[in-house]
């Protein structure tokens, strides 16, 4: 299983000069793990297990992820995976291609465009599905029935996770807002189904440092007009 990359030193040829320097190359860090975290049921994993797996995937990433979404469904398609929300701030040069695609625990690619909605390619993690066709064009992927269902499922799971965090810990959600708003606002502009869910937890900051949802702002405007 691919877990990040590592540097390897190439051996020098026999006729190399005495002062020749060995060349180093970056290679995939492959680990033989027959039971990776994403293949386990969510009930089998603790919070520390998710953090440990993130460190395995991204050994050069020192910041902890904000939270994760565990994907686990076997009908009408088969999909497992773990997605992580990294701290994004307002960085417009965010590196994509951080989500790795596997089929039956065999690494395929880290380009998931056409499979994962564009706005979610800002996340990190792993998805594994035998139902995603390989070696086909992006337009073919986007037209494939199973891929459409997988894409919609991932979008819904991310929206549900964000909604749950907002409802359970409003203050904590507000504290994370500047680190996650890039994904949420991008998703609201590009995906109608995500917008329908996200408009209930998307936040608008005020100059006083308070945060309001769109519905709350409407109520405040009504109240001020009544006064």
Please identify what each model-predicted range represents.
Residues 1-227:
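Conserved GHKL (Bergerat-fold) ATPase module
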């Amino acid at each position: 299983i691919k877990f990040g990359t590592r540097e390897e030193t190439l051996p020098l040829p026999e006729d190399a000069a005495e002062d020749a320097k060995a060349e180093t190359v970056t290679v995939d860090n492959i680990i033989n793990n027959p039971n990776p975290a994403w293949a386990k049921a969510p009930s089998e994993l603790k919070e520390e297990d998710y953090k440990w797996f993130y460190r395995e995937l991204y050994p050069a990433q020192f910041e902890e992820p904000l939270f994760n979404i565990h994907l686990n469904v076997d009908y009408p398609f088969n999909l497992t995976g773990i997605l992580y929300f990294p701290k994004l701030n307002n960085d417009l040069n965010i590196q994509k291609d951080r989500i790795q695609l596997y089929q039956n625990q065999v690494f395929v690619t880290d380009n998931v465009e056409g499979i994962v909605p564009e706005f979610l390619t800002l996340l990190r993690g792993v998805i594994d599905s035998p139902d995603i066709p390989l070696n086909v064009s992006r337009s073919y992927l986007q037209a494939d029935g199973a891929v459409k269902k997988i894409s919609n499922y991932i979008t819904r799971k991310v929206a549900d996770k964000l909604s749950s965090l907002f409802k359970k810990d409003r203050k904590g959600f507000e504290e994370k807002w500047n680190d996650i708003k890039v994904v949420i606002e991008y998703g609201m502009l590009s995906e109608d189904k995500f917008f329908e869910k996200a408009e209930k937890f998307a936040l608008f900051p005020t100059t006083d440092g308070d945060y309001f949802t769109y519905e709350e702002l409407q109520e405040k405007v009504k109240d001020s007009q009544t006064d």
